[in-house]
Amino acid sequence: HKYLQDRDSLVDAETNIYTKREGEDITVRCYLTFSGSRKLLCKETCEEGNILIDTYRDEDQRGRYSIKYEHRYIRSSILDVTITKLTKSDSGLYRCELQKDWCPDSEDNFKIIVTEGEFNPQNHEDISIQPFRKSTFKE
């Protein structure tokens, strides 16, 4: 089974990437294939030391990290992940995971890139989304 060997590159291709500036908050929605009682939010992998949240509750918070779980349908649920006051060290790969005794684990990955530049809500203007026009620079 080739796709098992290429699993890492497969995950890579499907990983959503979010870019934010230092100081901003972010909420990312993880889509999971079944409902599960144990919810985990991890950095990189869900190994000891990488687990940010490990809970059986539908809503939980640990410091700057919080999750909100919603069971949608028999084979579908969502986990909203919020990280507040982002820092450069928050950049990286994250994993949402649902665990159930008699089911395989369900997981979703996302990547955050935190760019430099203090976020200031008062004068925040995202110039990156404005089209470049020469007429802006009239003499």
Residue ranges: model-predicted function:
Residues 41, 65, 77-83:
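Short, structured motif recognition centered on aromatic/hydrophobic residues
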Residues 33-66:
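N-terminal V-set
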Residues 2-28:
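N-terminal edge beta-strand
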Residues 30, 41-42, 94-97:
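Core motif of extracellular immunoglobulin-like domains
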Residues 20-27, 74-78, 86-96:
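Solvent-exposed loop/turn motifs of extracellular immunoglobulin-like beta-sandwich domains
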Residues 87-89, 93-119:
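Extracellular/luminal immunoglobulin-like beta-sandwich modules
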Residues 1-6, 115-139:
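Type I single-pass or GPI-anchored cell-surface glycoprotein architecture
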Residues 30-34, 85:
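Non-cytosolic beta-sheet module surface loops
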